Every structure is written in structure tokens, then in C-alpha cells.
Amino acid sequence: MKSIMSDDGTVVTCQNSGEGPPLLIIHGTSSDHHYWQFAANRLTDHFNVFIMDRRGRCESGDHPEYSIEKEFADVAAILNSFDDTVYVLGHSFGGLCTLEASLLASNVRELILYEPAIAFDQKRLVLCDRMESLLESNQPEAALVFFMSKIVGISDKEIELAKIQPDWKERLSAAQTIPREIRALAHYKYSAESFRSIRVPTTLFVGGDSPQSFKTMVSEVQATIPNSKVVELSGQGHIAMRTAPDMFAEQVVKTLLHDEL
């Protein structure tokens, strides 16, 4: 396990395994390192895989004062703790954290951004209110399912698959972190001008069956970052690392190691 102390004194940890160049994975909202284990197990022959637990999860600490900027700083602090350059893979909210952290660290080797969440319509915050009411009434499973279905747009089939996975209990424990991330994202202002300075190779993954909102955000980021490209994950949605881990891992290896399977 790797751990660092972020700027506000919060301890942030990563679980790691494998051999090869370092690959740092930044998970999205409602998940932790367990969520990525399916895909990570298929990457460890090629990379030393580090899966970050963002603040408020597993062995990572938390802080009573939350801000989205602290999330960015956490990822940057992890990156800066490596002696070598690092491949980075960020998903959804973690994709945004990865994007912002790449402006704060100088050792990013290459980026994969899987449907980075760069916006949340403030008109939809009423959905966040509903989720919070479920959490306040001690219904974490109902709250998590509501988030997945009504806010993210994950299919009923994918939700039922998620419920039978061994990490479901951990996801329920972290459900209280979801509303703060949604509200922070709703007030976040995406600055295209800032990201035009990114020069490391950048690939955006998008599910062929993902909601249009994610496809739109991918297109916006791709138009911003010079020489970036988009790879469509055919037949997949927002969570291909769970629904098709073999295919997903193969695409990561092809992207980062340039077809050296």
C-alpha cells in the first residue's frame, strides 16, 4: 500500500500490485479500489497498478471541510510522490480529478480519461436532494441504486450485477460521499483554456451505449486537449471495467503500450 498526506493533513492511500511501469487509477463517485480489482487483475502483468482510494473511503482519511479542489490536490500529491513518470487512468468524477491534477503535477506520462465528468446540470440537483433524503433515513442501498439509475443512467441489468459483487458492502459504506461530489461538480466551472496546455498523450474512452450526456462531455474534452483521441468501447456503457474487464484491460494495454500485447 502507498500512502501520502495531502495539503490539509488528510492521509490518502493506494493499493498496488503488479510489475512494470506505474499506472495510477482514479475511481469515480460511489466506488473505491475494490471496484477496479476486476480490471486491475488483468493489468498487473504489464503495469505496477496503483488504485487510489479517494478521501472518505477505505483506509484513506477524510476532512470535515470538503471541496473539489482538495480532490484535485490529493491526486496531484499521489502523482508527485512517484520518482518515475506515471500512466494515469481516471474514470468519471475521477477523470475530472485526473484532468485537473495533470496541471499540478509534472510527471504524468500518458492519460486515459474514461468519460470524465466535467459538469452536472444544477437543475438536476433535486435528484441529489432525493438521494440525501434516503441517506438521512438510513437507506444507503436505496440511495446508491437511485444514484446509479436516475443520476448516472446505469441500466437495471448493470445495477443487479453490481449488487451481487463482493464490493457492494463497501460501496454502501461510501454512499455518504456521493452528494458532496455531485454538489461540488454542479458548481465546478470547466476551463477549456487551462487544459489546452496539456501536452502528454491523452486518450478518451467512451462507451458506445453510454448516455448522451457522457458522450457530449467526452467530445468537449477531446476538442480541448491538443492531439487527444477518442476510443469507443463498443457495446459498453459507463462501467466497462466491470461489465467487460477483459476487453477493457486489453484496450488499456493497447493504448498505453501502443499495441505491445
Where are the regions a protein language model picked out?
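Conserved hydrolase catalytic core segment
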Residues: 84-121
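Active-site loop/oxyanion-hole signature of alpha/beta-hydrolase fold enzymes
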Residues: 41, 50-89, 93, 250
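Catalytic histidine-centered segment of alpha/beta-hydrolase-like enzymes
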Residues: 233-246
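Conserved HGGG/HGGXW glycine-rich cap/lid loop of the alpha/beta-hydrolase fold
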Residues: 6-61
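Conserved alpha/beta-hydrolase catalytic His-Asp/Glu region
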Residues: 123-124, 139-179, 186
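Conserved serine/cysteine hydrolase catalytic core
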Residues: 170-223, 229-232
